[in-house]
Structures are given as structure tokens and as C-alpha cells.
Design a protein with these regions (language model features):
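N-terminal "arm"/small-domain region of PLP-dependent enzymes with the aminotransferase-like
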Residues: 1-50
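Short glycine-rich anion-binding loops that position phosphate/pyrophosphate groups of nucleotides
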Residues: 21-27, 66, 125-130, 160, ...
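Short, conserved active-site loop motifs that form the nucleotide-linked donor/cofactor pocket
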Residues: 60, 151, 176-177
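Active-site phosphate-binding strand-loop segment of PLP-dependent enzymes
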Residues: 104-162
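Conserved core segment of the aminotransferase class I/II
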Residues: 179-212
Length: 212
């Protein structure tokens, strides 16, 4: 946006940025206490408990933005066949390809024919950019078929805050189901670089180790 403002000589304040789905009205911010700058984060500081309560999840893993999990999760599986329901956020397919997986970008009508040949299915719900919302029952049916073979259903719920009734957060303790949530978009606080992975304990522990 700054580059465009410079190129067209239009003040930054006069632009409406439609290139990203971040709310332009940030959540009201209190004064930041000094200890937030001087102390290391702690696992019992209330962040995880607050996130579990908000999302309705049994457990969460805080992330430096959901992008951290998008890049790390493909490294936790051996090379396999990954279906990415497209169109969607391009970093998903890119990350799985970079980790050596065979990635097929599929349309909604192709899920049923291809599902039983996949090791991982990735769904962005609600979809970005189409806005399509998949109902939990349909996603859980896909998850059951994948999980029987040791597969994963990975659901990116970065834009789910407006339609929480469609979230799989409450089911995220099931083996082979991973839900990603973004904090910055809905609350307009992208600079915080905060996201969460929701899943069963062993998987979240493995992800934490992968992230270091």
C-alpha cells in the first residue's frame, strides 16, 4: 500500500486497502503494561484459557500467526497425497509442495471422487476468496473417511469469527482433525501476529516441537 501511495502520490490515509481481509476497526486496546515488554510469555498466563473459552475448544496451541502452522504442519508428515480445496489462500498448497508432498488443487465437486486417495485434505472455511461456508456435518464426514486411514483434515478457519456455528473448534480433539484460527483478522490486530492451532494433545505437542 505504501508503494502504491508513493507511485500515485496519494496520501496513505486516503486509501481503502481491499487487498487483505483484516478488519479496519481494531479492538479497543488498553494501555500495555511494562511487564509485557520485559517478561517472557508463560503457558499459564491466561492466554490459552481465554482462547479455549472463546473458540469452544478443549485445547489450543498459540502460534506466531496461523502462517507458522501452515508452514510447519507439512513437515510433520512423510510425503503423501494432499488435496487442497481451491481456490483458496495460496500459501497452503505452496507449503505442502515445498515439503515434498504431491498436491492436487481440487474443486468442491472433486472432493468425493478423490477423497479416498488422499492422505490430507485442506479446506479453508469460510473460503477465501469465495465466501463458501461448509457445514460441520459434511466436514466431519470427510474427516472420518480420512482418519480411518491415518489421514488428516486440516481446516483453516481464519474468517470463522462471524459464523461460529459452522466452526469445528468443539470437535477439534478428534484424532486427525486440525483447525487453524487467526486472531488478527477479525479483531483488526494483525500486528500482534497471533494465531492458534486446535487439535488433539499429541498432535499439538508434535507441532510445538516442530516450531521449536
Amino acid at each position: 500500500l505504501r508503494e502504491a501511495a508513493r507511485r500515485y502520490d496519494i496520501p496513505l490515509a486516503d486509501w481503502l486497502d481491499l487487498s487483505t481481509g483484516i478488519a479496519p476497526w481494531p479492538f479497543p486496546l488498553p494501555a500495555i503494561p511494562e511487564q509485557a515488554w520485559t517478561r517472557l510469555p508463560e503457558s499459564d498466563d491466561g492466554l490459552e484459557a481465554a482462547a479455549c473459552l472463546y473458540y469452544g475448544a478443549e485445547r489450543v496451541l498459540p502460534l506466531a500467526g496461523s502462517q507458522a502452522a501452515i508452514q510447519a504442519l507439512p513437515r510433520m508428515r512423510r510425503g503423501g497425497r494432499v488435496g487442497v480445496l481451491s481456490p483458496c489462500y495460496a500459501e497452503h498448497a505452496h507449503a505442502w509442495r515445498q515439503a515434498g508432498h504431491l498436491v492436487r488443487e481440487i474443486g468442491e465437486a472433486e472432493v468425493e471422487p478423490y477423497l479416498d486417495s488422499l492422505d490430507v485434505l485442506l479446506v479453508v472455511n469460510p473460503n477465501n476468496p469465495t465466501g463458501r461456508v461448509f457445514e460441520p456435518a459434511e466436514l466431519l464426514a470427510w474427516h472420518a473417511r480420512l482418519q480411518r486411514r491415518g489421514g488428516w483434515l486440516l481446516v483453516d478457519e481464519a474468517f470463522m469469527d462471524c459464523t461460529p456455528q459452522s466452526s469445528l473448534a468443539a470437535c477439534s480433539n478428534r484424532p486427525g482433525l486440525i483447525v487453524l484460527r487467526s486472531f488478527g483478522k477479525f479483531f483488526g490486530l494483525a500486528g500482534a501476529r497471533l494465531g492458534f492451532a486446535l487439535g488433539e494433545r499429541p498432535l499439538l505437542q508434535a507441532l510445538a516441537e516442530q516450531l521449536g
